[in-house]
């Protein structure tokens, strides 16, 4: 008889009164986003939205990492002939859900946020961060673009700030991120900041928040076509043999594209 071992959960989920705490729980892997992680996030939002008492979803990291984007090991295992990357579609669906759900989504950041993690932060309703937190979009170093991140990031911090992050791939401090509008509040104690914000936010019902988000989205350029454009832009890049090789060399040898072999 073959023993089937279930994978360890990618998320730690805890209910606190009217708040659902969702913690990225793969710090040894820098809290990257795997298909398993995306599936668990989808189920967590399903459960929270079905609960009429729930008002807030709190997203947190662990081990010095909030979230560092798509998992490179999983990405390199995809066939270059895949017609559509399921992971990219599910990631885009996650960002859309955060931006439209009737729940208030708070990202509480204590550590590093990179790549797709920036998209989660940008889509969130409120972003709280400790002074030690850092934010970056390093995709261009491997020949990729943060295509799925940018619609939400531009909405939050504007065109030039988003373009600068994408072009330079430089890391922004928590203070710089606050000044750019990516972070809403710096706090030494995230627990205290969340508790203070929750006192008023838990008084809003889900339908009010849903209508609020829907109306604000009408005031911006986000649409089904925008999201589709983002996914269509990233798909040929993740299938490109050159980019696949760049990522594979980094995964297997910790070698960046500009570093020559031997």
Label each PLM-derived region with a short phrase:
Residues 1-62, 199:
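Conserved CoA-thioester-binding segment of acyl-CoA-metabolizing enzymes
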Residues 61-97:
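Glycine- (often His-adjacent) and acidic-residue-rich active-site loop
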Residues 95-142, 171:
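Glycine-rich beta-to-alpha active-site loop
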Residues 128-133, 183-228, 258-262:
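C-terminal long alpha-helix characteristic of the crotonase
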Residues 126, 164, 168-170, 185:
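Well-ordered beta-strand positions
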Residues 1-7, 248-262:
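Terminal low-complexity tails and localization/encapsulation signals of metabolic enzymes
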């Amino acid at each position: 008889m073959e023993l089937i071992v279930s994978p360890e959960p990618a998320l730690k989920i805890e209910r606190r009164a009217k708040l659902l705490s969702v913690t990225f729980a793969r710090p040894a892997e820098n809290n990257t986003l795997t298909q398993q992680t995306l599936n668990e996030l989808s189920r967590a939002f399903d459960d929270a939205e079905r609960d009429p008492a729930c008002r807030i979803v709190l997203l947190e990291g662990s081990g010095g990492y909030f979230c560092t984007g798509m998992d490179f090991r999983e990405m390199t295992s995809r066939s270059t002939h895949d017609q559509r990357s399921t992971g990219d579609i599910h990631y885009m669906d996650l960002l859309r859900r955060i931006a439209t759900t009737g729940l208030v989504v708070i990202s509480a950041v204590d550590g590093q946020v990179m790549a797709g993690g920036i998209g989660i932060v940008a889509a969130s309703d409120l972003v709280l961060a400790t002074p030690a937190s850092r934010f970056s979009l390093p995709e261009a170093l491997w020949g990729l673009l943060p295509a799925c991140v940018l619609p939400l990031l531009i909405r939050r911090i504007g065109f030039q700030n988003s373009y600068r992050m994408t072009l330079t791939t430089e890391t922004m401090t928590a203070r710089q991120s606050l000044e750019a509008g990516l972070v809403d509040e710096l706090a030494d104690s995230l627990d205290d900041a969340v508790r203070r914000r929750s006192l008023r936010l838990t008084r809003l019902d889900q339908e009010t928040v849903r209508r609020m988000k829907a109306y604000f989205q009408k005031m911006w350029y986000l649409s089904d076509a925008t999201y589709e454009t983002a996914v269509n832009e990233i798909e040929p890049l993740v299938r490109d043999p050159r980019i696949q090789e760049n990522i594979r060399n980094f995964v297997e040898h910790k070698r960046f594209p500009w570093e020559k072999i031997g």
